[in-house]
Amino acid sequence: MEELRGYLELDRSWQRDFLYTLILQEYIYSLAHDHGFNRTIFLENAGYEKKYSFLIVKRLITRMYQQNHLILSANDSNQNEFWGQKKNLYYQVISEGFAFIVEIPFSLQLLFSLEGKEIVKSRNLRSIHSIFPFLEDKFSHLNYVLDILIPHPVHLEILVQTIRYWTKDASSLHLLRFFLYEYRNWNSRISIKQYISFFSNRNQRLFLFLYNSHVCEYESIFIFLRNQPSHLRSTFSGAFLERIHFYEKMEHLVKVFTKNFQVILWFFKDTFMHYVRYQGKSFVASKGTSLLMIKWKYYLVNFWQCYFSVWSQPRRIYINQLSNHSLDFMGFLSSVRLNPSVVRIQMFEKSFIIDNAINTFDTLVPNIPMIGSFAKEKFCNIFGHPISKPVWADLSDSDIIDRFGRICRSLSHYYSGSSRKKSLYRIKYILRISCARTLARKHKSTVRTFLKRLGSEFLEEFFMEEEKVLSLILPRDSYTSQRFYRGRIWYLDIFCIHDLANHE
């Protein structure tokens, strides 16, 4: 009982005071600059990062609130455009620092939770590829999957309320509201979905923090119910409700949960339920029946709408059978298929042949989306035929080969866990021929001439570094080497989806 309360109850000691004062510290902006996701603002304003000082930071905040200097002549459109960009610069700088500051309570809580526990603090745990071995082990035994588009909050105040759980500094919350509503005011005619897209492009770090903190709020309850089915019947619902105490629908929640709590607990009895989230999607896979998945679908819709004021619709959740459906997951097409095998058993003078089928989790390179990405970047046409890259034709030969080679090696590294290498070889072929066509275009020659001139050295640029290492360690004709070349290898140093593999 105490363990459950410790999980659900609000730990007020982690609420941070006076985060707002850190905004006036110039070192915060240096740290935000070093770890920020988007550095284009500093690259476009050369030398700006060297001018940070206490006075400049205060001046930026002052100008954010002073709108009079932006009221210029309506006829002078160029001047208005200049001041609009400058105002955007002020918001960009301050919001990056603010995003770094509000992450502090979460970082401190994570470090505290690791103290006294034998948990390896490895960067490899951050790799997005670490999820695939888990999927290979679990999903091959499951039947159905819910393909969920995570809904966006219907109001900006919901994001502010989520941060209220972690800090009681009112000034910081007011500043957060100011950022959100100022971005909203600039684009008052756009929808909430368009606004979120606009805001995420302008300030990725702050948006990712707000989005993840909001999603983690309902995930903490969702996953808790999934992991603790045997203890919930003896748990008072008040402890469960305390987790989301700051929502205004407290009285309604108490009535609903007191009345229907036993029904909800029965709903979470499936011990074969697995949950995976990435970007704006999530998967809930189960070994249950289609009827159970339909109940899950409508429960999630009501869960978001009633308890978290998040608008969702049943059509945003798709029920699919794993054996007949492929998941578009982090640039891979993942599916569960039957892998037939024949076993011959010899018993004395008689022999038996047994047909056996085992479910395997396949991860494939999606051909059509990849060709679409390559066509968009001008490596091939929409049919997959390699073409030259005119933008790179002015570079030196070594730079052209190096750029194509790095793209090829990075894609090979990313798709090293693919079940079938044929599609990966197709990608290498497109890049290799596109490189040759670009060089031929530069020197006004033919592709065949360049392939003859460069020979094997040209092909080596498109090998993975891992393949070179394996070829040095293991003989090409050895059984172990062949298994490495044909098998799946998941590398734990990949922290984001490859740009060409991101088909969202």
Curated annotation (Swiss-Prot):
It holds the Pfam family MatK_N. It is found in: Plastid, Chloroplast. GO terms for molecular function: RNA binding. Its main location: plastid. It comes from the Eukaryota. One of its GO terms (cellular component) is chloroplast. Keywords: Chloroplast, mRNA processing, Plastid, RNA-binding, tRNA processing. GO terms for biological process: mRNA processing; RNA splicing; tRNA processing. The keyword RNA-binding applies. The keyword Ion transport does not apply. Usually encoded in the trnK tRNA gene intron. Probably assists in splicing its own and other chloroplast group II introns. Belongs to the intron maturase 2 family. MatK subfamily. This is Maturase K. It comes from Nepenthes gracilis (Slender pitcher plant). The gene is matK.
